[in-house]
Amino acid sequence: MLKRFNQYDNFIFDFDGTLADTACEVLSCIERAFNKCNVAFDKERLNPSVMGPSLAEIAVIVKPDLTDEQIVNNIVAEYRKIYDYDENDITKLYDGIRDWLLYLKQNNKKIFVATNKPKIPTLRLVKSLNIDFFDDVYMVDKYDDKKLTKQQMIEEIVSKYNLLKEKTIMVGDCLSDIEAAKKAGVLSLVALWGYGADKKALKDKSDFYLEKITND
């Protein structure tokens, strides 16, 4: 299972677009939040290409003339109510992900999550998707008194677990994941099955890239 990476000891994974395909669930909850707030929008603008930015930014992408900050905040709040505890979540792991994670664990590799996703839905999904065996899970709101950037998450994981940077890979699907890895001094592996749109740039800027999970 991706044996060519056996020389590396530590793997830090992004969540949305890397481990799991969350787009359908997220977009459905955004639509429900807009409807709950009685805000009309062009449904054609609500597609997987909007994935990545914060919810507030997505709301404005979906409805460019939405300039009232309070309405944006209301949409975000409604989304959180719907998404955080959705018992009918349709999120699914990408093909081969669980097997890869198990392979890494069985070969004494350390595995982590570093995601801009909030704590409640992240921990809910890690459990419901049956991948709750990470060495640690870092989320944007892991701490109550501060928000973490992706770079800070990586740096703290490296420091807390005494990881060698040259033996550590950040696995993500967006340019921001690659940039965070470089700033934190670790290697980057881009998952081309994710939401990052510019595949050429992702290939050019990352240390490694994967189009699919294989047994080599």
Task: List the predicted regions and their residue ranges.
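Short acidic capping loops at alpha-helix termini that bridge into adjacent secondary structure
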Residues: F41-R45, Q70-I71, D132-D136, K165-I169
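N-terminal helical cap/lid subdomain that shapes the substrate entry/recognition surface
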Residues: F5-F15, L19-R98, Y103, N107, ...
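Substrate-recognition/cap helix-loop segment adjacent to the acidic, metal-dependent catalytic center
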Residues: N35-C37, E57-L66, I90, R98, ...
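Short, acidic/turn-prone active-site loops that include or flank metal/cofactor-
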Residues: M139-D145, L192-A197, T214-N215
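Structural recognition of alpha->loop->beta junctions
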Residues: L129-M139, K200-D216
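Acidic, Mg2+-coordinating phosphoryl-transfer loop and its flanking beta/alpha structural elements
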Residues: M170-E211
